[in-house]
Amino acid sequence: MGKEPAAKRREYFPRLLQLVLEHPRVLVVSADHVGSKQLAGIRVALRGQATVLMGKNTKIRTALRQQLQQQPQLQALLPLVRLNVGFIFCRADPAAVRAVVQQHKVPAPAKQGVTAPTDVFIPAGPTGMDPGSTGFFQALGISTKIVKGQIEIQQAVQLIRRGERVSASAATLLHKLSVKPFTYGLKVEHVYDNGSVYSASVLDITDEQILEAFAAGAANVAAVSRAVGLPSAAAAPHSILEAFRNCAALCLDTPFCFPQMQRLKEMVENPAAFAAAAAPAAAAPAAAPAAAAKAPEPEEEEEEDGDMGFSLFD
């Protein structure tokens, strides 16, 4: 039996190093209050997308240090190996992997001494508890009354605040009310990507936000380039347009001209000629409906036919 842990340790090191070599993107997760059954469900859900690897911190640090000479970028992972930590080696997009992980949170009761991850409120109304349990409510400062043989909370109250430790009275009361106020699961703390470490919040950034930020940055570069007179790719379209406007103004005010401005300059110098040339073109479409309106006049031929018929009897 004594050799089994050593054998597992020898298998763990090459497996961790192989996963690090094959997966440049890693999610560093905390696994507080996560049970083995819940962890097994996450592994099944991530099959084909990612690999979950847990282990003791000392083993993880030892394995990473052994690989530092070949992969010095792994140094960035060492400070993250603390408390109850685990790695998710991603084959799919890390944001998609995190979404799967977040779907596998389970409700859990509030245990005494546990730090509350969220605020806990008790709503007003009947509790289903008999009057003999009023001591729990009194110890917590919750006002109650007896209605139809059961305890009823008069108004909603905040029982536990986020970050505080759960007291024995609060844990007992929530247990009696059959309330499981907390949800636990793997929590993504950091993202490791080819030697760089980012906060998990980077996974919330969308493609649209990246495009908006890039467009705003390009606009700022163009504005600065134009202000200081320094050419840049972002400012080139604006600079070319402004230069063309300056050339156009120069052509209109001086004898100088170039082919692209020749017709415009002639229009400015002799607007009457262009107005006269444009008048027939504008009148032609207007004359077409008038001609179409006069078309139905041949009905007078019927009257002539009638006169000719009556003249035969004269």
Swiss-Prot record:
CDD domains: Ribosomal_P0_L10e. Pfam families: Ribosomal_60s, Ribosomal_L10, RL10P_insert. Phosphorylated. GO terms for molecular function: large ribosomal subunit rRNA binding; structural constituent of ribosome. P0 forms a pentameric complex by interaction with dimers of P1 and P2. Ribosomal protein P0 is the functional equivalent of E.coli protein L10. This is Large ribosomal subunit protein uL10.
